[in-house]
């Protein structure tokens, strides 16, 4: 109606607009109208996020995977074997939309160079998305086409499945490296609402459909390709890689050399305490950025390698922000206080929120979001879909609404409960950076150096004394030798 139109018009008022709607009384907006105004203002949310994402980087940039491809690109994999950075790159490339480019067969394939060229052509022609960041993805694909290290890698066995009924989002691709091994890459969460729902299902399900398919896919690869295997993935893909490594058959597990988990969530306590986890845990290599908020979810038993990222907060999950020096990641010794705070909060929340209530709350939220026609998360912020979501939220039954509200109440309580520990860690971190604390550390270091020097001096003095004593005893023995002979 005209009333709604003027309520939702965020453009600058013009004389024509004022005259056109002058006859409409301007009453204060209701709460519903106010919510509509706020949500409509966010209707172009995905573009706002993209603009914000571009600014969410610190100035202390170092080389990332793009620079690595150019720097290391002249050395084929048969000369310099696959490293951790290569594994991150191949894991990230699994997000590319290889549909109609790479087939699901294992006896045929397409080179990474040809696949990259087709992806760029389709993106240019149809303006379709690539992985997550079109501008950076285009640069990466162009560099891969010229890289002797990556361009001849063969892509085989591509599968991509999104099943709203089963609440499953699963995709995987296998790379034939050309140096006698194959890399099985599992895709992480994409932009689909179903994909995000499956992620949340992990908090109360022992096994989700994507995990079952990951096991089946890895075993299928092992039967189709007679090569040693490396499995890996980024985000949920890392979780799928670890799960596949645990629950494949013994013959397949014996052929898996390494499992890469790049900032992927962990598992419930029953899974990480299982016998299957113990069979593969020494082969799992988990990498997280210093402010990780995704990779620290759920429970882990394997050690972390902390990677320096120039992203801010949750945007450190983006593989393009991970910093590289030469052929390896820039590694840090400790995660930030924000990451520890998120970790403590989520774990406390999951302990307080029983599995049945988790299921009810998550199913309720998903039912509301599914009321729209949007398949992707970004679609939810379109005007027509937003109104559908609001209507569904208003029609939510009392039991489901109570479960959702209780979940958010417990989340708030968990956040408050984690504040003291966060403040303590923050204060300790800040104190360590203070000038007087640094001088104190320098004094401690100097004292340690002096103590070591004194210890060395004492050791040398004792050694000399022992040498003199031994020499004196030998001289005395020589003097007494004639007497002893007599």
Regions found by a protein language model. Name each.
Residues 2-9:
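Extreme N-terminal basic, low-complexity initiation segments
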Residues 11, 22-24, 48:
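Short hydrophobic alpha-helical segments enriched in small aliphatic residues
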Residues 60-85, 90-172, 177-182, 186-201, ...:
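Alpha/beta hydrolase fold serine-hydrolase catalytic domain that processes acyl esters and thioesters
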Residues 233-237, 241:
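Gly/Ala-rich beta-loop-alpha elbow adjacent to hydrolase catalytic centers
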Residues 241-250:
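Short glycine-enriched nucleophile-adjacent loop
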